[in-house]
């Protein structure tokens, strides 16, 4: 991205001319607040309105590798319209989306100040959260949120997500920005605790993880057209297990480089020799007996209607994207239910001169 374009984007942000969000165009009657006090943050489907106030400019501009934490107040309203204000410490996080040349807004990490937490707060179960800010347009946030919802259907050992409508108030300059459509993500420790597990931080090979969950995860990544992951480097993967004796389960996250999301910056690594992220490539390890996939294929077939309905029923996506995505899903189901194409696609890691064993390292230096 050219420097002049970066400057233009920054000026647009701080003069309040960020493109109008998809959410702002939706009739609020279709998104009821609900009784937020009777459920946790991720038990609700409605878009949550929040306001972040503090030295927002310094927070968003601090994109160094060792970014500092900045005090930020998080405001939202309960069902009775009572405003709740919580103290937090926020900092930029991530790799690709953290860079100015890639995204207008960087992803944020939220740490709640426990001494300030109210018992009735919607966030009382949270100590940390990830906040995905809109990178280039709100519609891609919505698309990625739907991908998290797909994986939630596959297994509870998955990260939960909730859309949030964000207003930014810079208390130093008195400028406000928004609304922006973002996404709150469940923190790793909470996800692990919810499933009676703990994080596993040692490096493993794919074959050393739980076979059933790995196949479900790898086929899911194939479904969404995502190749930006690896077990070996924990690239967009977290590992969890009940104890040191249990085989680890791989949990995927960060799907913005998938074909089903279709972000404008998403490109497959050149080593995979793919034309675009819309071209699928199965990236599991070599399995020659296709019967080993039977249980996984049965699972995806059982979930087919539910997966399709996520897109059919979603009022936040436009009709063009809905139709193209349903067609993309049709291609997936045609593949897994045809023995010949299944063997060709899922047997790719066994191909001697193929790229099936390429390990995605991402932006890591180790």
Can you say where each PLM-predicted feature lies in the sequence?
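Phosphate/dinucleotide-binding and metal-coordinating scaffold of catalytic cores
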Residues: 23-366
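Bacterial Sec-dependent N-terminal signal peptides
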Residues: 1-26
């Amino acid at each position: 991205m050219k420097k002049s374009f970066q400057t233009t984007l920054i000026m647009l942000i701080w003069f309040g001319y960020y493109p109008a969000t998809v959410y702002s165009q939706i009739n609020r009657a279709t998104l009821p607040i609900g009784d937020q006090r009777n459920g946790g943050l991720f038990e609700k489907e409605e878009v949550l309105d929040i306001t972040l106030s503090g030295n927002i400019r310094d927070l968003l501009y601090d994109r160094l590798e060792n970014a500092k934490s900045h005090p930020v107040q998080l405001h939202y309203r309960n069902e009775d319209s009572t405003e709740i204000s919580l103290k937090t410490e926020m900092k930029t996080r991530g790799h690709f989306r953290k860079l100015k040349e890639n995204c207008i807004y960087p992803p944020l990490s939220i740490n709640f100040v426990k001494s300030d937490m109210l018992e009735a707060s919607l966030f009382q179960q949270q100590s940390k959260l990830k906040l995905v800010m809109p990178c280039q347009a709100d519609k891609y946030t919505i698309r990625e949120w739907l991908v998290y919802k797909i994986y939630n259907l596959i297994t509870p050992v998955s990260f939960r997500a909730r859309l949030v409508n964000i207003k930014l108030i810079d208390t130093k300059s008195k400028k406000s920005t928004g609304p922006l459509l973002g996404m709150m993500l469940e923190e790793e420790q909470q996800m692990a605790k919810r499933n009676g597990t703990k994080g596993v931080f040692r490096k493993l090979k794919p074959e050393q993880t739980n076979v059933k969950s790995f196949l479900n995860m790898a086929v899911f990544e194939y479904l969404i057209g995502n190749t930006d992951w690896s077990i070996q480097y924990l690239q967009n993967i977290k590992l969890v297990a009940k104890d040191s004796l249990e085989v680890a389960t791989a949990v995927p996250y960060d799907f913005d480089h998938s074909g089903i999301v279709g972000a404008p910056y998403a490109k497959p690594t050149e080593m995979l020799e793919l034309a675009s992220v819309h071209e699928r490539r199965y990236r599991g390890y070599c399995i020659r007996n296709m019967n080993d996939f039977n249980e996984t294929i049965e699972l995806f077939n059982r979930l087919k209607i539910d997966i399709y309905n996520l897109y059919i029923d979603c009022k936040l996506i436009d009709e063009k994207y809905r139709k193209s995505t349903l067609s993309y899903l049709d291609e997936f189901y045609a593949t897994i239910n045809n023995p010949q194409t299944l063997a060709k696609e899922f047997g790719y890691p066994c191909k001697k001169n193929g790229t099936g064993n390429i390990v995605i390292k991402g932006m890591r230096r180790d």
